[in-house]
Amino acid sequence: MIAIIDYGMGNIRSVEQALKYIGAAYIVTSDKEEIFRSDGVILPGVGAFPKAMDILEEKDLVRVLQEIGRSRKPLLGICLGMQLLFEKSEELQDCNGLSLLPGVIRKLKVPYKIPHMGWNELKKEGEIALWNGVEDGSFVYYVHSYYADCPNEIVYGVSDYGVEVPGFVAKGNIYGAQFHPEKSGDIGMQMLKNFKGVVETWKSSQLSI
């Protein structure tokens, strides 16, 4: 069972539809016990970083997500949800994030239209489980005005938008997509299927303990 975190700022409906399409069992929840009982977690998000962190704090979900992230349970952040995984953001004000990944969220300063919205090529950097069946140079769908300034060793996919935008990051059990896999057609569905596979592998490992 995958828990989709509902904190009032997520693209919940589209993520739900995507998981339903790939046949993944899921629950939409903000209940701490349900999240801890899940086999994997998706943190979606659309909107402002500081407001999102305030809401997560109010719901006592900061602690929950940090515990999930520091365990071996698979966690996938999408768009703003990915950005929240980092140490802090410069959006509106300096604001601390979940600190599960090293790096800072900075505003895009490019000679192009902001937000970066639409399809862009994703170049793979290294191999991870979520790349199974995903071709290098596939196109994915973005909507964002901020990007992750983070160490190269956690970057597994990049797109060019005047700067090199980390499109996909990963460290251990933690994954983050700056783009929207649930809106990225067959390629996005393949990535979510791969995440489902990672979740199932983790679940099986727990049953054998």
Swiss-Prot record:
Active site: 79, 180, 182
Origin: domain of life: Bacteria
Predominant cellular place of this UniProt entry's protein: cytoplasm
Domain Glutamine amidotransferase type-1: 1-205
Pfam families attached to this UniProt entry: GATase (PF00117)
GO molecular function: glutaminase activity; imidazoleglycerol-phosphate synthase activity; lyase activity
Key word Ribonucleoprotein present: no
Catalysed reactions, semicolon-separated: 5-[(5-phospho-1-deoxy-D-ribulos-1-ylimino)methylamino]-1-(5-phospho-beta-D-ribosyl)imidazole-4-carboxamide + L-glutamine = D-erythro-1-(imidazol-4-yl)glycerol 3-phosphate + 5-amino-1-(5-phospho-beta-D-ribosyl)imidazole-4-carboxamide + L-glutamate + H(+); L-glutamine + H2O = L-glutamate + NH4(+)
GO BP annotations listed: L-histidine biosynthetic process
Function: IGPS catalyzes the conversion of PRFAR and glutamine to IGP, AICAR and glutamate. The HisH subunit catalyzes the hydrolysis of glutamine to glutamate and ammonia as part of the synthesis of IGP and AICAR. The resulting ammonia molecule is channeled to the active site of HisF.
Quaternary context: Heterodimer of HisH and HisF.
UniProt-recorded name of the protein: Imidazole glycerol phosphate synthase subunit HisH
The organism of origin for this protein: Bacillus cereus (strain AH820)
